Amino acid sequence: MPHSWDYDAVVIGSGPGGEGAAMGLVKQGARVAVIERYHNVGGGCTHWGTIPSKALRHAVSRIIEFNHNPLYSDHSRLLRSSFADILNHADNVINQQTRMRQGFYERNHCEILQGNAHFIDEHTLALECHDGTVETLTAEKFVIACGSRPYHPNDVDFSHPRIYDSDSILSLHHEPRHVIIYGAGVIGCEYASIFRGMDVKVDLINTRDRLLAFLDQEMSDSLSYHFWNSGVVIRHNEEYEKIEGCDDGVIMHLKSGKKLKADCLLYANGRTGNTDSLALENIGLETDSRGQLKVNSMYQTALPHVYAVGDVIGYPSLASAAYDQGRIAAQALVKGEATAHLIEDIPTGIYTIPEISSVGKTEQQLTAMKVPYEVGRAQFKHLARAQIVGMNVGTLKILFHRETKEILGIHCFGERAAEIIHIGQAIMEQKGGGNTIEYFVNTTFNYPTMAEAYRVAALNGLNRLF
């Protein structure tokens, strides 16, 4: 006789991974509950990560545009805005996103349970509700999509009012004139752009020898130059020895002997999976040192009926990929296998000012692989559309095989890079000879557009062949 479960599946977390899994499951007729520890759905992506930081970036970039465009300003008076002012814009976007995503669950009759969950056994969860009561619920299968949080080393006092992580920085209530950002990964670089755009002095501490080393070096160098040109001080190959919180700021002692003082510190060096409260030891699952779970190609953990998606499984730790992982896991959970899979070349969008976006191989990778490739480039300053809107800083680079003309990688630096990249990605994904740089020469683009950069870059690259 089949077992009677409360639900066919329970999804822990309502971020992109949890939402993708939940929507995929209910569309296939499963009885699903989603557990969310906070009062609103959306997870860290909506409330502390992707959405608010990109909303902040947009507001700051518009201020920069106003102050530098003679159409709006004669430079005699600069537009300034407080951090609290631009946070209001982020709050409005968060509220819109929350209402929209809440509607997804309601329309699809997917139950939302609020509280903190942990495993009692392999098919039972305890749910600690916000009113203090504890409920138990059973399910045949589970999807862990509880996301991640900023990594907190034990020797940094995050309770100090001038020491922030990438979550708490959204509660900044004073106006810093100088900020230290420790960690020059994606989050650190994005916030360096935001603060410098607000005319705040920025010391960016990088524990490696160059910014965002996973990028094509030309893109990384472009960002480094742009930071230097805007006044960001980058300190490479540095690690902190000690961090002191003071009444009026923070002092950072570096292992190299240097000392830095600023009004506040943003610690942005790594993230940890939110698995420590799930009591995974009760079901025999283990995580790595960063709280992340190992999964197979169908996102199953060591327990076949327990799946995991999103930041909690590590790379690529992208909201876009997490949603697809959830959708694929839902298909595998219901049907026993998944016909869908993540694409091999996942685009990366980095929302610095200007943006950076990449898909496919870098020049360094192709050189190491001994692939005979050529490069086609288009400078934004030569495009009519860029001249019209004042977006002269930027470049599009296409890497393609010299013999087959197959596109191997696309890299873009400049405003709207994260949008522009998808044109090339669509061609890269074509099968049966459809992936060719000659497409951009043989098609007709609207004029004037930023998309025209592809035709310019394609012609530039093809003209290099002999």
Curated annotation (Swiss-Prot):
Its cofactor is FAD. Pfam families: Pyr_redox_2, Pyr_redox_dim. The keyword Flavoprotein applies. GO terms for molecular function: dihydrolipoyl dehydrogenase (NADH) activity; flavin adenine dinucleotide binding; NAD(P)+ transhydrogenase (Si-specific) activity. SUPFAM superfamilies: FAD/NAD(P)-binding domain, FAD/NAD-linked reductases, dimerisation (C-terminal) domain. Its EC number is 1.6.1.1. InterPro entries: Class-I_Pyr_Nuc-Dis_Oxidored, FAD/NAD-bd_sf, FAD/NAD-binding_dom, FAD/NAD-linked_Rdtase_dimer_sf, Pyr_nuc-diS_OxRdtase, Pyr_nucl-diS_OxRdtase_dimer, STH_gammaproteobact. Binds 1 FAD per subunit. It is found in: Cytoplasm. Belongs to the class-I pyridine nucleotide-disulfide oxidoreductase family. Conversion of NADPH, generated by peripheral catabolic pathways, to NADH, which can enter the respiratory chain for energy generation. NCBIfam families: PRK05249.1. This is Soluble pyridine nucleotide transhydrogenase. It comes from Salmonella gallinarum (strain 287/91 / NCTC 13346).
